[in-house]
């Protein structure tokens, strides 16, 4: 049953097949601090102190993340506290919203899965990144679908460039 006023949950999956080192790609997607460098809707992602109840994994596992978007004159921004809740190098990383202000918050989940076709000895196929975003709140409006879709398309070459620059330097 939907909450009153809720349009619907948002579930988006995007894939990227790219000729980049799998380990270097994983290094980028496992660290939310890199996202502002290649994903424009993430305007800021700063590490924050992990707190009891975060259930974070993998070192600095919590970030304060600012999301922003604009369609015509309409602007939206959102600050989230995200925690890396799963990290299985070099295959899977998952981030979940974890606020500690005593209020009830909408669910945000971002996961990334990497498939390295060369890991089993095959040649010629490119590594594939599959990212999934789930938003369980009621503030999503249809025009944000277009914004997100456009941003995903623009981010693909930026991510490849960013990974290649980091692995070369």
Where are these regions (language model features)?
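Solvent-exposed residues in well-ordered beta-strands and their adjoining turns
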Residues: 17-21, 66-70, 85-87, 115, ...
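Hydrophobic pocket/interface hotspot
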Residues: 25-29, 35, 84, 131, ...
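Short amphipathic alpha-helical signal-transduction/dimerization elements
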Residues: 33, 148, 152, 156-167
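Glycine-rich portal/gate segments that line the openings of hydrophobic small-molecule binding cavities
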Residues: 47-99, 162-166
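A short, structured loop/turn motif at beta-sheet edges
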Residues: 22, 50-57, 85-91, 113-128
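Beta-strand/loop substructures that line and gate deep hydrophobic ligand-binding cavities in soluble
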Residues: 94-154
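Short, surface-exposed coil-to-beta transition loops
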Residues: 11-13, 76-81, 104-110
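Hydrophobic ligand-binding cavity/cleft-lining segments
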Residues: 1-62
């Amino acid at each position: 049953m939907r909450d009153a006023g809720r349009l619907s949950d948002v579930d988006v999956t995007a894939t990227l097949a790219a000729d980049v080192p799998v380990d270097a790609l994983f290094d980028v997607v496992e660290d939310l601090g890199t996202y502002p460098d290649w994903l424009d809707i993430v305007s800021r992602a700063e590490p924050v102190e992990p707190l009891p109840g975060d259930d974070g994994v993998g070192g600095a596992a919590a970030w304060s993340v600012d999301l922003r978007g604009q369609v015509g004159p309409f602007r939206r921004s959102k600050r989230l506290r995200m925690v890396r809740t799963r990290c299985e190098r070099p295959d899977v990383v998952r981030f979940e919203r974890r606020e500690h202000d005593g209020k009830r918050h909408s669910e945000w989940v971002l996961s990334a899965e990497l498939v390295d076709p060369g890991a089993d000895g095959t040649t010629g196929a490119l590594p594939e990144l599959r990212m999934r975003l789930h938003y369980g709140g009621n503030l999503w409006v249809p025009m944000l679908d277009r914004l997100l879709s456009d941003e995903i398309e623009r981010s693909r070459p930026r991510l490849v460039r960013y990974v290649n620059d980091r692995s070369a330097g």
